[in-house]
Amino acid sequence: MKKAIAVDWLDKYGGAERVISSITKIFQIETCYTLINIMNEEDLKKVFPNNNIKIKNSFLQLFKSKFRYLFFLFPYFIKKIKVDKSVELIISSSFSVAKGIKKTNPNQIHISYIQARNQRYLWDKEGIYFGKKVRVLLSPILNLLKKIDTKQASNPDYLIANSRFVQNWIKETYKMSSEIIYPPVDVENFKLQKNKENYFVTVCRLEPYKRVDLIVKAFNKSKENLIIIGSGSQENYLKKIAANNIRFVEYSNSSVVYNYVSKAKAFIHAGIEDFGIAPVEAQACGTPVIAIKKGGLKETVIENKTGVFFKEQDSNAILEAINRFNKIDFNYEFIRNESLKYSTSNFESKLNDFVKSKIANDKR
């Protein structure tokens, strides 16, 4: 059986790319269709260890790193990609428009793994991506893109959600059903660390939607120590407002992150995630999580056993959660064991079984 994968774009290596790598490995993918490939060679080898894979790009390749400015044309260009008619199985990994790739043969099976709320900038209700005035000006275009996105969501034969949170979003937004298969987390490469030190840690991109500003404001009111690992557009602002008990560490490599996360009292996360890989990695070290009780983290954190929740994105709510956390005696080994259900091997086994069952059904 000839197989291909469709992805939105290839630029940086992260959680979404780990999923792509696993899919490629499981199904021995031969061809990757994408809007654009601007990923460096080192990262590309992580995604596709098999150097024989063919990467086919769209016209957007001409725009290189400026391609995001043409976001309103993404649905058009994904539709224009022509999958080889000899391909029998298409698996799309979609956080934007990859699900919209069209079959070129009625006998093809298209299964889409929905990595996140697709094209979040279209469906954003919190005003994170566009200010109110800009959103009003763009509303005719955004409304049209919503209709196209909903239509393209019906292109796959089957949808898989990466969390219950995303599954509910798919149902609410596209009026479609989906199965849940949690994404692969490299928990096997994290070791249990029982000797915790006197600091909290957060690791993420320093962007507005991650709400690191709320974590900083909470620790400004606290005597607890905080280490922030990451970079982004808010870095200078966060450093400016941070008190002396808050330290910033630039992300250099995974061993640096592991060293800080494994020894931390707790990992703190204030953003609403579709799944949230970093908090699961923290738990793989035996490090409890303090997180917003919304999004995918509701599924990966067990209240008072593997972490503590706060209900609203508010600095006082975070501070109150820290105070509750300090009164709980956590079992680090239990936390580590709970993280193992999100292993890469579990993901690969469940996805393989799902695809096999759909192929078998299709042949009946």
Placement of each model-derived feature along the sequence:
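Acidic donor-binding loop of glycosyltransferase active sites
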Residues: 262-274, 287
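Active-site donor-binding segments of glycosyltransferases and PAPS-dependent sulfotransferases
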Residues: 32-99
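Membrane-proximal helix-turn-helix segments that form the acceptor-binding/catalytic region
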Residues: 84, 130-159, 167
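Nucleotide-activated donor-binding/catalytic signature segment of Leloir-type glycosyltransferases, i.e.
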Residues: 236-255
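Short hydrophobic beta-strand element within catalytic cores of glycosyltransferases
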Residues: 288-292, 301
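A charged, aromatic-enriched C-terminal amphipathic alpha-helix characteristic of glycosyltransferases
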Residues: 74, 313-316, 327-358, 363
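Conserved acidic donor-binding segment of nucleotide-sugar-dependent glycosyltransferases
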Residues: 303-304, 308-315, 322-329
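Conserved donor-binding/catalytic core segment of Leloir-type glycosyltransferases
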Residues: 185, 191-210, 216-227
